[in-house]
Amino acid sequence: MKFYLDEGIVLKGSDFGDGHRMLTIITKELGKIKAVAYGAKKVKSKKRGALLEFSRTNIYLRQSNDYFIVEQAEGIEYFPNLYGNKDLLHAAGQIAWLTDRFWPLGQLNPKLYNWVLYSLRLLNSGVWPKIVLRNFELKLLAFTGFRPITTHCAVCRKPYRGEVWYFGAGEGGIVCPSCRPIEGIYFEIFPEVVKGMNALLLASPEKLPELLLDERVVDRVKTILEYFLGYQLGEPIRLL
């Protein structure tokens, strides 16, 4: 029987029998895991507060055949502002949902782990949710092997010089007019949108609050990412 001490962020939880919780947790050392917290729904349980959705927690785990069992949990960091604001709570939920869909069980992804944490902190501190979400979505794609090509044509590799081009999900990024097929779904993409995507891709957590982007640009990035993320998942999705 193996035991582990790890740090994790709770993405989601559901009822599991009488008074128990089945949790999806991303961790530093074990990757994404499923874990049962026995008795976590009970009012007097010490695990209850430490295993709230979106909390950062030290967890002592025991491995069973099908999942991990949470023996002990100690909260490290909470984001109280998320729970008092419906829009922020939904934004955090979208981050958790996308992370769960793109992060396979048992795989390590320290860069994505850190960016989930950064994004929750930014939401909790009052940074514009739309810009936090677009930044997170682009970083998610980058850290899971789907970073969109935004500096040159994804087909012929012609450098982008600020013209009106197109974004193709199948090509994985921007496509020049000469390479755009007649058929298929392509999004017209203007220079300010390409510039905005690159700024969001490169922004650090410290610089993101200072990033000034027109809301129309942010909304256009959302439209493109909504289709691109859905394309990678194999199903249409809706972003906030």
Curated annotation (Swiss-Prot):
Pfam families: RecO_C, RecO_N
Keywords: DNA damage, DNA recombination, DNA repair
Encoding gene, per UniProt annotation: recO
Family the UniProt entry places it in: Belongs to the RecO family.
Biological role stated in the UniProt entry: Involved in DNA repair and RecF pathway recombination.
Transmembrane segments: none
HAMAP family in the record: RecO (MF_00201)
InterPro entries assigned to the protein according to its UniProt record, in alphabetical order: ARFGAP/RecO, DNA_rep/recomb_RecO_N, NA-bd_OB-fold, RecO, RecO_C
Gene Ontology biological-process annotations: DNA recombination; double-strand break repair
Entry protein name: DNA repair protein RecO
The keyword DNA damage is annotated on this UniProt entry: yes
One Gene Ontology CC term in the entry: bacterial nucleoid
Superkingdom, taxonomy of origin: Bacteria
